[in-house]
Amino acid sequence: MNRRDFIKSAAASAACASAGIAVPSSLSAANEAEKGWRWDKAACRFCGTGCGIMVATKDGKIVAVKGDPEAPVNRGLNCIKGYFNAKIMYGEDRITHPLLRVNEKGEFDKKGKFKQVSWKQAFDVMEAQFRKTYDELGPHGVGVLGSGQYTIPEGYAAVKLMKGGFRSNSIDPNARHCMASAVLGFMQVFGIDEPSGCFDDIELTDTVIAWGANMAEMHPILWARVSDRKLSDPDRVKVVNLSTYSTRTSNLADIEIIFAPSSDLAIWNYIAREIVYNHPEMIDEEFVKKHCVFTAGPVDIGYGLRPDIHHKKYAPSELDTAATEKSKVLSEAEGVTLSYLGLKAGDTLENKNAAKADAHWQITFEEFKKALAPYTLDFTAKVAKGDPNEDINEFKKKLKALADLYIEKNRKVVSFWTMGFNQHQRGTWVNEQAYMVHFLLGKQALPGSGAFSLTGQPSACGTAREVGTFVHRLPADMVVGNPKHREITEKLWKLPAGTLSGTPGSHYVKMMRDLEDGKVKFIWVQVNNPWQNTANANHWIKAAREMDNFIVVSDPYPGISAKVADLILPTAMIYEKWGAYGNAERRTQHWRQQVLPVGEAMPDIWQMLEFSKRFKLKDVWGEKKVNDKVTLPSVLEAAKAMGYSEEDTLFDVLFANEDAKKFSANDPIMENYDNTEVFGDSRKVIGSDGKEFKGYGFFIHKYLWEEYRKFGVGHGHDLADFDTYHRVRGLRWPVVDGKETQWRFNTKFDPYAKKAAPNDKFAFYGNKNAALPTGDLKGVKNQEKTPLANKAKIFFRPYMDPCEMPSKDYPFWLCTGRVLEHWHTGTMTMRVPELYRAVPEALCYMHEDDAKKLGVLQNEIVWVESRRGKVKARVDLKGRNKPPVGLVYVPFFDENVFINKVCLDATCPISKETDYKKCAVKIYKA
């Protein structure tokens, strides 16, 4: 039977069964093929949509995956990556044993070659190197680069081990690269993280506007829902795509707006100006007066580059861009947009507030209106038109039509965005601007209306953000810098007072810079690929390989970071372990372990717990110097008073305590399912102590979950209990009295809003205790703070140029991103034969006019070169992505087209998120 006949047979068999008709023998082939399969629900491994899938196993291997028809997110659909969840675990070069660089004697040697070693030898060397650095440099000399792909229990264990055990806040996720600007936007505007809306908005809205979000490829299941909504009422429902190049998302759009890089800042202000100056009657005055305040902040904040503009590690070609961190000469456009500060084109702006980039203060509506004045249609079109071949008047019509859609009375509008917004030198600003427009119109936190940040990774929300795996965060939106938050955390973790450090560690990009500077000498990488995914990669690879440090990479495959490492730990993949993810609409989903890990691979939780066994309280809870200004006190005496011994290990105190052991290994949820951490498994892996690992004997995942959820209950982040999630297809938090929340801050739907303002429609309770000084557009005039009392903030943020723009020597913009078929750096998907065949290499998408000028033809190889590095890539002039003249697009999934060697490591100064979307390059034939 061939594939087509099998599918026909399966369909016919299902139809007969539903009709109560006996299945003929000729139609039973599909049923026979599935004989002995066990199906169970799980979450997709890939993007932040959070699709539910069904996983089939037989004989200890995953044999099939399909969309879960009961999953409310995807309703049985999968995208092309989703259908290959089963195959990501079975690549030919899967790492199955620990690998250590050794010399001829079998001893660790940084210049040695990888050799298979035991888990015991791996941990022996890892422990020795960790102790060496910890003793030399203190808690912040060691670091963890984590992930928005951590399961929630993994992220929680990592935070507890690093911050509670080693007293180090130097743990940061790769979500710093993708969602930090959205996070800071939420925190600055709402005082609490994550979207107010949910995916139900798609079916309820009249208008979908995508800003820097190629949803057709990056969130294809959501785009299927958008397409369905559009087709259900094509005349009423409008779709707009705003991007710096044409994408598949434009295929459905009524309006496509190709804008110049960074000019989204100007476009948002134009829309706000249209509202305030030309349609003041459309301002929802009741909403704005009751629920909002107007704010502004400094503009002289730099670009997130190194503060030392003459740093010895910079190449001469990098110095011009590096200098902008200290000051820059204002352009003609900036002379207009910053005129409210008394500045003009040609002035030098000194970046004096880089260290206070997040500062802001309350202003009046009149000041806000004054700042919007320059953003006329003519000015904005001149700044924002991104396609040189487009007629300026046609572009103006599009901008006006865009504004009209937002402004139209009774029109519901959802604004979606992803990396085009977040990976931006003013990423926090542009997130704030989206809320600005929605607030002015009263179109936020309503069914079918709202500004909605889409998450890129499967648990950037559920783990990186909610758990707090950022250097400055703790669970449930708490921060290490707040003494009260540290106190709450110490009590929940049963730590002595003063254990936690109040000093944030090095964020993702700074950790790489600190590695290059010798300030960090031990990094443990988990569930991501930093040496491929971090911009200006040549610097960081050289630092890792040529300097005195030790890099541990937990990975299933030999990606770039694994190749850079000193020690590789083989890690279990998603369905080889128990886990949970949290998606972009605050939906939390759990799954069971379906199969045993390959070879001797072990789950990340196991790796962390085994490492924690090697450190006693006396090793890490004594007096510890963080930096020249901060020394952590010894808490050993306080620990003794709590019943601990200085001989207790971190494992004993943090993970195998009395509370943990209450969670039985005989839990019925585990019946007929493996749990490697709890029981060990039939592989009889020889563990980190040289003995067979037979399990911890208690339900570690359930313990971690139930302890973690205590942080959010009663604080607006309520999660359900462990058992509930195994019965349902996910729930959107806050989950109060067993009921999920669709729209936050709306008293009709959100119990926390209802509690905060029982007689009102809205309450932005994240700001219930917040207060701001007052001033004007130029700064603070009165330091006395005015309470916000459940109000959100409407920010004014000006247009500013990026720090590096095309020039005579580097005449093209470079933008990077993903493609539908591959995930991030391709570590998993490039090993799936079907996905590899579909897209075997990253291409350089270019406009035909540019190719003609360069004498380049379709499929020819070119060099893409910046001030930082260069790579070869094959030119595509006819593909899915269609850049305007002057811009090229190169995805980052292909390690053989290592585009992050070319990209600039500038970041948003507030969020510290890298801007991968704009730098200057030159193109020439290879």
UniProtKB/Swiss-Prot annotation:
Keywords: 4Fe-4S, Electron transport, Iron, Iron-sulfur, Metal-binding, Molybdenum, Nitrate assimilation, Oxidoreductase, Periplasm, Signal, Transport. [4Fe-4S] cluster binds at residues 44, 47, 51, 79. It catalyses: 2 Fe(II)-[cytochrome] + nitrate + 2 H(+) = 2 Fe(III)-[cytochrome] + nitrite + H2O. InterPro entries: Asp_de-COase-like_dom_sf (IPR009010), CT_Nitrate-R-NapA-like (IPR041957), MoPterin_dinucl-bd_dom (IPR006657), Mopterin_OxRdtase (IPR006656), Mopterin_OxRdtase_4Fe-4S_dom (IPR006963), MopterinOxRdtase_cofactor_BS (IPR027467), Periplasm_NO3_reductase_lsu (IPR010051), Prok_molybdopt-oxidoreductase (IPR050123). Its cofactor is [4Fe-4S] cluster; Mo-bis(molybdopterin guanine dinucleotide). This is Periplasmic nitrate reductase. Substrate binds at residue 892. GO terms for molecular function: 4 iron, 4 sulfur cluster binding; electron transfer activity; iron ion binding; molybdenum ion binding; molybdopterin cofactor binding; nitrate reductase (cytochrome) activity. Mo-bis(molybdopterin guanine dinucleotide) binds at residues 81, 149, 174, 178, 211-218, 419, 423, 529, 554-555, 577, 604, 816-825, 900, 917. GO terms for cellular component: membrane; nitrate reductase complex; periplasmic space. The keyword Electron transport applies. The keyword RNA-binding does not apply.
